[in-house]
Regions:
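PP2C/PPM-type serine/threonine phosphatase catalytic domain
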Residues: 1-307
Length: 307
C-alpha cells in the first residue's frame, strides 16, 4: 500500500492603509486575494491554493482626488485581469505584465477622455505567491521587501529619479532622502500611453515574511525599524499595525500602506536550502529607452541641483 504525503503551503497576510496626519484623502489602495475563490480582502490566513494568493499596493497621484480614483482603478482592473485570464500556458510573469498593461491602458484612456481626472496616475506593486515561488510585478516606487533569517532585503528597485542617480554614482542613498528630485517617479500607471512592468521572482522559504508598502512607509520608516518590528512580532495583524503607527509617529506627511505576509508549510524550503534570493529579473521591454524623454528633460536642469 502506497501512502501519499501532501505538502502544505500556508500563508498569513494582513494589510493596513492609513491617511496619515496631513493628507485630506487616502490615495493609497491595496487588496489581498485568494485566487481559488477570487475574493478581495484586508486579511487572509490559510492554505495557498494552486492558483495562488495575490497581494497588491497602489499609490495614486494627480491631486484633487485624482490619485484616489487612479489607485482604485489600478487595483480593480489589475485584479480583474488576474481573475479572468488564467491562461497558464502564457506563464505567471506574462499574466502579471498583461494585467499591469491593461490597468495602464484603462487609466490612461480615462484620464485623456475626462478633463476632471486628467493627469491621474498610480504606482503598482503586486506579489503573486504560487508555492514555492513568489512573482512580483512593479510599476513605480511602491516596494516589496523580503525578511529572512533576521535580515531585510529590498526586492524591488524604485523606478525613480533618485534611484537612477544612485545607480549612476551621482548621489548616495543617504543623499536621496533629502534630494529635491526624491518625489519624481519615472513611470506610473496612466502617466503615459505605455509602461514597462518589471517582473522579479524568487523562491520562498519557511518563516519568510513579505512586506509590500507605499512610499509613505518606505520613505519615512528606516529599514532597521521595519525589521525590528517584523522579527519581534509574529502576528502579522499586530506587526502591520505597528509598522503604520511607527511611520506616522516619525513624519506622517503621506498616506501609509503596508501588507505583511508570513510564509509557512513544508511546500516551502528551509531557509538555508532556499535558492539564491533573486532567481530572475526581467522587463517587458527596455525601461531605460522608455524613460529617455523624461531623463533628457531633467538633464537640462542645473547640475548643482542634481548633485
Amino acid at each position: 500500500m502506497t501512502t501519499t504525503v501532501t505538502s502544505s503551503a500556508l500563508i498569513k497576510i494582513h494589510g493596513v492603509s492609513d491617511i496619515g496626519k496631513v493628507r485630506k484623502l487616502n490615495e493609497d489602495k491595496f487588496s489581498i486575494s485568494n485566487l481559488s475563490v477570487k475574493d478581495s480582502l484586508n486579511t487572509y490566513q490559510g492554505e495557498v491554493s494552486k492558483d495562488g494568493c495575490l497581494m497588491l499596493v497602489c499609490d495614486g497621484s494627480g491631486g484633487d482626488g485624482r490619485g484616489e480614483i487612479a489607485a482604485k482603478l489600478a487595483v480593480d482592473i489589475f485584479q480583474k485581469e488576474i481573475f479572468t485570464n488564467e491562461q497558464e500556458e502564457i506563464g505567471i510573469g506574462a499574466r502579471l505584465i498583461n494585467a499591469a498593461n491593461k490597468a495602464n491602458e484603462v487609466i490612461w484612456k480615462c484620464s485623456k477622455s475626462n478633463p476632471s481626472i486628467a493627469g491621474m496616475a498610480s504606482t503598482l506593486t503586486a506579489a503573486l505567491v504560487v508555492p514555492p515561488q513568489v512573482y512580483i510585478v512593479e510599476v513605480g516606487d511602491s516596494r516589496c521587501y523580503l525578511v529572512r533569517d533576521g535580515a531585510i532585503t529590498q526586492v524591488t528597485r524604485d523606478q525613480s529619479m533618485v534611484q537612477m542617480l544612485i545607480d549612476g554614482g551621482v548621489i548616495t542613498p543617504h543623499t536621496a532622502k533629502i534630494h529635491p528630485y526624491r518625489n519624481i517617479v519615472l513611470q506610473s500607471l496612466g502617466a503615459r500611453v505605455s509602461v514597462v512592468p518589471v517582473i522579479t521572482s524568487l523562491e520562498l522559504a519557511q518563516k519568510d515574511r513579505l512586506l509590500l508598502c507605499s512610499d509613505g512607509l518606505s520613505k519615512n520608516l528606516p529599514e532597521e525599524k521595519m525589521l525590528e518590528i517584523i522579527v519581534n512580532q509574529e502576528d502579522v495583524v499586530i506587526a502591520s499595525q505597528q509598522l503604520i503607527a511607527a511611520a506616522n509617529d516619525l513624519i506622517a506627511d503621506d498616506n501609509v500602506t503596508a501588507i505583511l505576509a508570513m510564509i509557512e508549510g513544508d511546500a516551502f524550503a528551509k531557509a538555508e536550502k532556499a535558492a539564491t534570493l533573486l532567481l530572475s529579473e526581467t522587463a517587458d521591454g527596455d525601461l531605460s529607452e522608455e524613460l529617455e524623454d523624461l531623463t533628457s528633460e531633467l538633464s537640462l536642469i542645473d547640475e548643482d541641483i542634481i548633485n
